[in-house]
Amino acid sequence: MTFKGFSKKDFKTMQIPGLDARMAGIQNDIQPKFKAVGEELTTYLSAKLGDEMFLHIARHQRRSVNPPESTWLAICHDKRGYKKHPHFQVGLFDNYLFIWLAFIYENEESTKIANRFLKEKKLLAELPDTFAISPDHTEEKTYPVHGGQLDATLKRFRDVKKGEFLVGKIYLPDDNHLSPGKDFIKEAEMVLDELIPLYKAALQ
């Protein structure tokens, strides 16, 4: 499909009651956009990183009762799976779109990564003021990257078994960057450029 951007309808899809109905909306309306966006950004990241990257689209297969509160695509260097590795995400809650560099609780190097970011503060200090962080990919709550929560979030990621660290940028449903499609792709590439140094540091 030709990607025309994200619309307010996409956010409303994440409010549809019921597992089956919401999953139908995600599969019919959102996932085709994820595939189109993801293929472009995967190609972009592969070229930028000099390493083949692979697209994964969340299937929510473990869901049996409650509908997913968010949905996403992930881009990772591992073709078989992304959750245990640093990876990039683009996804939606019902009230914002996110572009994250994500380290979720399955990550096997959380101690090393958190300690590196805590020690080498310049890596995160240089991020734009418009960026945000999150301690949990399943929760909507985010904090400004320079808002005073950074160290606590990194320490939780390091010390708590289910701790996570996500950093990037969020967009409200009426943000002009979400459409047309070419504008969103350009914006996403700019965000990824800011996150690539962190990604590389995490893999060292």
Curated annotation (Swiss-Prot):
Q: Which domain of life is it from?
A: Bacteria
User: What does the similarity note say?
Assistant: Belongs to the UPF0637 family.
Report the protein name in the record. UPF0637 protein lin1053
InterPro entries in alphabetical order: UPF0637, UPF0637_domain_sf
Please list the coiled coil stretches: none
Species, as recorded? Listeria innocua serovar 6a (strain ATCC BAA-680 / CLIP 11262)
